[in-house]
Amino acid sequence: MIVLPNKVRIFINDRMKKDIYLGISNFGFENDIDEILGIAHLLEHLLISFDSTNFLANASTSRSYMSFWCKSINSATESDAIRTLVSWFFSNGKLKDNFSLSSIRFHIKELENEYYFRNEVFHCMDILTFLSGGDLYNGGRIDMIDNLNIVRDMLVNRMQRISGSNIVIFVKRLGPGTLDFFKQTFGSLPACPEIIPSSIPVSTNGKIVMTPSPFYTVMVKINPTLDNILGILYLYETYHLIDYETIGNQLYLTVSFIDETEYESFLRGEAILQISQCQRINMNYSDDYMMNIYLNFPWLSHDLYDYITRINDDSKSILISLTNEIYASIINRDIIVIYPNFSKAMCNTRDTQQHPIVVLDATNDGLIKKPYRSIPLMKRLTSNEIFIRYGDASLMDMITLSLSKQDISLKRNAEGIRVKHSFSADDIQAIMESDSFLKYSRSKPAAMYQYIFLSFFASGNSIDDILANRDSTLEFSKRTKSKILFGRNTRYDVTAKSSFVCGIVRGKSLDKTSLVEMMWDLKKKGLIYSMEFTNLLSKNTFYLFTFTIYTDEVYDYLNTNKLFFAKCLVVSTKGDVENFSSLKKDVVIRV
């Protein structure tokens, strides 16, 4: 670890795929409480800008921090990627503090699209922020557009909170020129922020929250000490369904269960977690997980690898102390309990955006202060991989699981999805057959539309057959190529339970690079949040799908795009009753 005079921390990580990865602690959307919710997320969207033909890049805003990364591709170099990312924050050697109203307006529209996307596909309910005075969704809404001047002032104010002590930088390689460049830019920031937030959010403990969830989860408040952080790292590397959350200066260990009986035993104090010592902790974490640790605990004064001897040599005492603290929090009701609930009728409170939820007090009724049993935890394996064809009965359940667990990777190709994970076969089956997970997986049917229409365009099956068998196997096979005949009609209007645009496009020079560039152009215009595309077996032919509330504008953009010499697009209007009748007459797919 290299520490600049203003406390910027720089790490060399030659194993990461990114060229540069930057995080800003104490800079997430928890800072929006008592201001306009969404300022942090809007700032993230305003800052990131790059040439998608030369770079891969992304950014994210969480409760307590913001992070950005950039990777060079094609003819660009690592140095180009570093300078590109730094340019998001600095202009002419000074920290950016000017945002045009037109750009703010476009990105607010994009935020509304992101809200729509996330609520169609996920359950984006942030319990901790809600209990701390925020909303269940804190990513920004379209009504921000009514206060553009106030929003711009808040954005400038937020930029002035950035300080050297907040900055963490990972680089793949660090030469003298790069280090000097960092000193001239992030190293020029003040060591302490010029503007300090007026309040640090504090959540309310002793609550039971009934909300959609794939698991029965208990958030246990523990002290944010070094030993407890090392204990969390130990548990995370060894077991599944254990993680942590932070808000303000508070730390919670999150423990999830698939068995309601075990969950209730843990809550009543009659059972403790069965934590056993493993052979060795290697700290072989992803760069995302490492960055999150440094940002959530900015007071860490050493490289995490400096603690590898301590976490292994002192693991017994660390885990005993952590186990005792967990049990004390259970007894004292320093917990937040999440109980899976999928009823739209049950509600006893709402946030300012009128999202309904049930919040109850966690009482001491039935509490047992002497545990007499232990609960086994799911152990991690080194690696596992499965391939699932489109239309397989387990497809959507596996996608749901990958979306709910950050350590599951999913890659899509023309025939199906390849999933990498570290579960045993028995554990993954137990999860996917559990009552709460099955309800959660089926509670957001919108994600299915992407695969329904991919099946329609790529398999040659009729829309009636696909809809009649949407939960069973629809074979994709390389043995037969679907010859797609593009007719005169380029638009087919349907009614579904989500608003989206999808279809197939063909172009002589069409490739993934041009489609990524197109996606970013649509994002800059505020018309979409993201666009998925799959390369079909027919030459230069792609399937596109995007959730959007601006369906006509997106259709017009795609319909007039000169990269496509043939297209067949489906435009869905949201409604209570599905109607795909327009697809039965004119769309011809010859196998």
Swiss-Prot record:
Catalytic residue positions: E44
Keywords on record: Hydrolase, Late protein, Metal-binding, Metalloprotease, Protease, Virion, Zinc
Localization terms from the record: Virion
Pfam families named among the record's database cross-references: Peptidase_M44
Textual note on the cofactor: Binds 1 zinc ion.
Residues annotated for Zn(2+) binding in this entry: H41, H45, E112
Effect caused by changing E35A: About 60% loss of processing activity
Keyword Thylakoid attributed: no
Induction (UniProt): Expressed in the late phase of the viral replicative cycle.
Molecular function GO terms recorded: metalloendopeptidase activity; zinc ion binding
Mutagenesis or variant effect for E110A: Complete loss of processing activity
Post-translational events: Undergoes proteolytic processing during the course of infection. May be cleaved into 46 kDa and 22 kDa products (Potential).
Gene Ontology biological-process entries: proteolysis; viral life cycle
Enzyme kind, highest EC tier: hydrolase
Mutagenesis / variant outcome for changing E120A: No effect on processing activity
Family: Belongs to the peptidase M44 family.
Main function: Probably involved in maturation of some viral proteins by processing them preferentially at Ala-Gly-|-Ser/Thr/Lys motifs. Does not seem to be responsible for the cleavage of major core proteins.
Official protein name in the record: Metalloendopeptidase OPG085
Native source organism of the sequence: Vaccinia virus (strain Western Reserve)
Taxonomy of the source species: Viruses, Varidnaviria, Bamfordvirae, Nucleocytoviricota, Pokkesviricetes
Gene designation per UniProt: OPG085
